[in-house]
Amino acid sequence: MAAKDLFHEVVRRALEKEQWVITDDPLKVEVGGAKFEIDLGAERVLAAERAGEKIAVEIKTFLGDSPITEYHAALGQFLNYRLALELSEPDRTLHLAIPITFHQAFFQREFAQLSVERYQIKRLIYDPVQEIIVQWIS
C-alpha cells in the first residue's frame, strides 16, 4: 500500500466540508496488468434529478527540496492515473490536490502554466491550515 501523503486527512476533511462523500480511500484501479492506488475517490449528488459527479483526487504535499522534481514525479503519476481511470471508470474525473503555498510559488511560473495547459491537469488547491479547498481549476 502506498504511503499516505502528509496532508491526506486535511484534503479529505476539506472535501467533506464541500459535501463530497468519500467512496474510496484509496481508490484502487486495475487496468492492463497494472494496479494503482489513487488517494481518494469521492462523489457528490448535484441535484435529485441529475447524475452524481465523481472525482478521484491525488494528494500531493510538494515539500521536497526540488519543486521541479516534485512536480515531475506528480505529473507522471497523474498522467498514468488519468489513463487508468479513462479505461476503467470514464465517468470519474481526476484532480491533483496542491497546497496553496506551493501553487502560489510554483504554478505561477511560465513553465508550470504551459505544462498544466498542455497536459490538461485539473487542480484542487487546498489550504492545509484552514482545511478548506480554496479553488478548483479545470
Segments and roles (model prediction):
Residues L83-V116, Y126-P128:
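Nucleic-acid nuclease catalytic cores
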Residues R118-W136:
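Charged, structured surface patches that assemble and position nucleic-acid processing machinery
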Residues A3-H8, R12:
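Nuclease catalytic cores
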Residues V21-A56, E70, V134:
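Active-site metal-binding core of divalent-cation-utilizing nuclease and nuclease-like domains
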Residues I55, K60-N80, A84-L85:
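Mg2+/Mn2+-dependent nuclease catalytic core
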Residues G41, K60, V129:
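Anionic group-transfer/hydrolysis microenvironments
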